[in-house]
Amino acid sequence: MVRRDLLALGITIPSETLWRFLRMLAHQHGQLFNASALAVAMGGISPITVSRYLDIFCDALIVRKLEPYFVNLGKRLVKSPKVYFRDLGLLHALLNIGQAHDLQGHPMAGYSWEGLVINHLAAQMSQGFGGNASLYFYRTSAGAEMDAVIDTGSERIGFEIKLSDAPRVTKGFWNACDDLQLSRAYVVAPVEHAWPLSDKAQVLPFVSLKQVLSSH
């Protein structure tokens, strides 16, 4: 399927190179894209070539590139994008995760969950914000971090993503809330009901995400 999609776009990459790159990239899912590390793992090709491969898979809608949110805060911000596979079935296949029970306890389980939420946010944004919002992540060298930030132009909404039925947030979460002056912040987790963390932050079940987005 992937090979056919690329051929339809007029892109010809040797099959061995294609699958090797995707397998390597799968281990960066949900993490900062590191072109230099991938270049070494691919046998010494240039980071520029690795970045070009990533752009090809983004254009083919196989991979999503989430850019960092830049605001003039006088802080040192992370500048590399994060990468997510749009099809988690493909991601799991590349990671040799065959069944749901294989995912439990897997080192990539949390990143898989993060990808599920990010993909859902991206898909639902147009319904909740009239197509005018943009999706980013936020991270500073000092440790402030938010997995996803929706900027509508009139407000910013933050989302921290935790694969835990008893999620806890760190100081970095609260620092990000302050840095970005978020109107609301949610910790999206596999929980059955929501509960407040503050007057502007709450833990949110994944199943409630669509309703929350449509209310903004």
Placement of each model-derived feature along the sequence:
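Accessory nucleic acid-recognition modules appended to NTPase machines
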Residues: 1-154
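Structural signal for conserved beta-strand scaffold positions within catalytic alpha/beta enzyme cores
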Residues: 65, 85, 137, 160, ...
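Conserved beta-strand segments of alpha/beta enzyme cores
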Residues: 134, 184, 200-202
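Active-site ExK catalytic segment of metal-dependent nucleases
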Residues: 155-165
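Active-site-adjacent loop/helix micro-motif of nuclease/hydrolase catalytic cores
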Residues: 165-173
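Short, conserved loop/helix-junction motifs that constitute active-site signature segments
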Residues: 177-180
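Short, hydrophobic beta-strand segments that form beta-sheet elements in well-ordered domains
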Residues: 182-189
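Domain-level recognition of nuclease-like catalytic cores that cleave nucleotide substrates
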Residues: 191-216
